[in-house]
Amino acid sequence: MKVLGLDVGDKKIGVALSDELGLTAQGLTVIYRTSLKKDLEEIKKIIDLHHVTEVVIGYPRNMNGTAGPRAELVKRFARELYKFTGIKPVFWDERLSTVEAEKLLISGDISRRKRKKVIDKLAATLILSGYLNYKSKN
């Protein structure tokens, strides 16, 4: 049972994938957004290639727990993904995932240029990892 993690942004979608047992998360790729149709096709290819059975999407919340300004866009994307793939996405609180990813990359002495290329993939990995940890404890 592989799980796909997505960090959906305006320009890029970070993608992470779990191992077969659903215990660990690894960054997979970054999709540079062009159109909704092409984005969905790209994700569907990944789902089919890796035999994904579950999809987790980072859900943007404010620090007080309310839905963030991008929440409606993410919900709309999730609805379209469900229609396209038949897999109903699970939302996972992505508060501070990008901030945490940035801190990890800075602490690893990764250059700004390289950080820009991988931050979305790392954020997706953190989102998926949080979800997998929660599932393993419940």
Curated annotation (Swiss-Prot):
Domain of life: Bacteria
Keyword Cytoplasm: yes
One GO cellular component term noted in the UniProt record for this chain: cytosol
Example GO biological process: rRNA 5'-end processing
Keyword annotations: Cytoplasm, Hydrolase, Nuclease, Ribosome biogenesis
UniProt-listed InterPro entries: RNaseH-like_sf, YqgF, YqgF/RNaseH-like_dom, YqgF/RNaseH-like_dom_sf
CDD domains to which the protein is assigned, alphabetical: YqgF
Protein localization: Cytoplasm
One annotated GO molecular function: nuclease activity
Pfam families, per the entry: RuvX (PF03652)
EC annotation from Swiss-Prot or TrEMBL: 3.1.-.-
Main location per the UniProt record: cytoplasm
Assigned protein family: Belongs to the YqgF nuclease family.
Function statement: Could be a nuclease involved in processing of the 5'-end of pre-16S rRNA.
Protein name according to UniProt: Putative pre-16S rRNA nuclease
Organism: Carboxydothermus hydrogenoformans (strain ATCC BAA-161 / DSM 6008 / Z-2901)
